C-alpha cells in the first residue's frame, strides 16, 4: 500500500519536471536546451524593410536620392520660388503686373 502512495505522489512530480523542461533526456541533454535549439532553427530570418524616407517611386528610383539631386540642382531654393518667378515673368511680359508692386 505504501508503494502505491509513493508512486501516486512521485509520478505527477516527475511529469511536471519533464513538462517544464527541468528534467533530462536519455543522453543527459536538458529538455530546455533541445527546445531552444529547435526554436532558433525554426525562427524565420527578419525581413529587411526600407524606411519611409528611402521609399522608391513608380520607376523604382530612390526618392531621397532624387530629392537631394533636385535640391542641389535648384541651389536649395524651394520649388514655389521657381514657379512663382516664372508666373511673375509671364505676367510682366503680358503687362498685367504693376511694376511698382512687383519689382
Swiss-Prot record:
It comes from the Eukaryota. It comes from Conus rolani (Cone snail). The modification 4-carboxyglutamate is found at residues 82-83, 89. Residues 55-65 have a biased composition (Basic and acidic residues). GO terms for molecular function: ion channel regulator activity; toxin activity. Residues 1-21 form the signal peptide. This is Conantokin R1-A. Residues 22-79 form a propeptide.
Amino acid at each position: 500500500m505504501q508503494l502505491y502512495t509513493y508512486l501516486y505522489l512521485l509520478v505527477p512530480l516527475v511529469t511536471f519536471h519533464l513538462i517544464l523542461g527541468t528534467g533530462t533526456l536519455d543522453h543527459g541533454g536538458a529538455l530546455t536546451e533541445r527546445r531552444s535549439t529547435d526554436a532558433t532553427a525554426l525562427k524565420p530570418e527578419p525581413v529587411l524593410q526600407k524606411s519611409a524616407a528611402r521609399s522608391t517611386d513608380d520607376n523604382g528610383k530612390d526618392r531621397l536620392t532624387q530629392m537631394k539631386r533636385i535640391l542641389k540642382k535648384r541651389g536649395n531654393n524651394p520649388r514655389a520660388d521657381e514657379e512663382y518667378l516664372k508666373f511673375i515673368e509671364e505676367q510682366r511680359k503680358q503687362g498685367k503686373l504693376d511694376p511698382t508692386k512687383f519689382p
